[in-house]
Amino acid sequence: MAKKRNKKAKQKPNSPPEEKSTSMKKEIASYVVIILVGIILAQHLNVVVSGSMEPVFYRGDVVVIEKTNLFGIQALNPSDLKVGDIVIYNATWFPEPVIHRIISIQTGSDGQTYYVTKGDNNPKPDPSLVSTGQIQAKVVSIGNQPLVIPKIGYITLWIRGL
């Protein structure tokens, strides 16, 4: 008799439909949260596509960025940028966004602010001035050291054919 009771005690009763439904909703909610966090994090990461900023960071590294406009929210004010900041901007001379350091700030004859940028590994400044409207983001730094995740961007470069 004792053996029969143990077998019955070990059997798990089927979950009622309400518990299964709640469990499924929690699982779906978990996946939605993971996807949203991934999207938000992806908005704050950028893959380095060239060696122009070596040895600060290398091709295939991922840098943490502060965007100028994230979902309509002004996260970074370009007028707060200073010499030494590393920015990502839409260049008129290159098809991909460029990640370079601000080496000088100028006021144009039109009264607008323009930035002179240069890759740390390049011998000369970039060929044209950068307007505040071209700036997409600033690389986040802690104690003058940019936040870099080494080499994990190679997969993205391979997929994009860069």
Where are the regions a protein language model picked out?
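Extracytoplasmic/periplasmic/luminal assembly and interaction segments
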Residues: 71-110
